[in-house]
Amino acid sequence: MKKLILVPLKRNDRAEDLLPYVEEVARPGMKAIFMVPYPVDGLRWSHEEISRKAIEEGKRLASYYTWDTNLRKARELIAPVVKALSAKGIEVAVDLRAGSMRRAVRDYAVKGDVHLIVTRASIGNWIERLLDSVASAFRSLIRPRFSSVMLINPRTLA
């Protein structure tokens, strides 16, 4: 059984931003699973009234929400990461998630084959934005750099 590295992505996360962290912890023979929320490009609504245009827009929306289209978009989203990690012997997969990302990560962790979870630290992003705004006013001060990524041991979740 291959050791898995889970990378749950939120709506606005870029896989390329997490690539250096995954490269650092992954070893050849491991498998990285990028968990992308469904729908990949966010929600869309129809703005047309009842008419022929509304029917045409409904068809476009139906094709926009198809699972295959979103899976293709998710694969295109992480294509640069796949290329970089495949060169190092790390297998990469896409898991398109329609439900709770937290529950999906917990389900993977319960199975026992997850080695590590790489995710963005929400509080880290907030602190980094705060320090960026303060540092713009006080450029002469040296500010500490916080890592905005957390590495989580899955045994702490179960």
Q: Predicted segment positions?
A:
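Short beta->alpha connector loops
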Residues: 11-14, 98-102, 123-124
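A short acidic, glycine-rich active-site loop
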Residues: 56-74
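General small-molecule cofactor/ligand-binding pocket signal
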Residues: 33-35, 93-97, 150-152
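Gly/Ser-rich helix-loop-strand patches that form or flank binding pockets
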Residues: 107-158
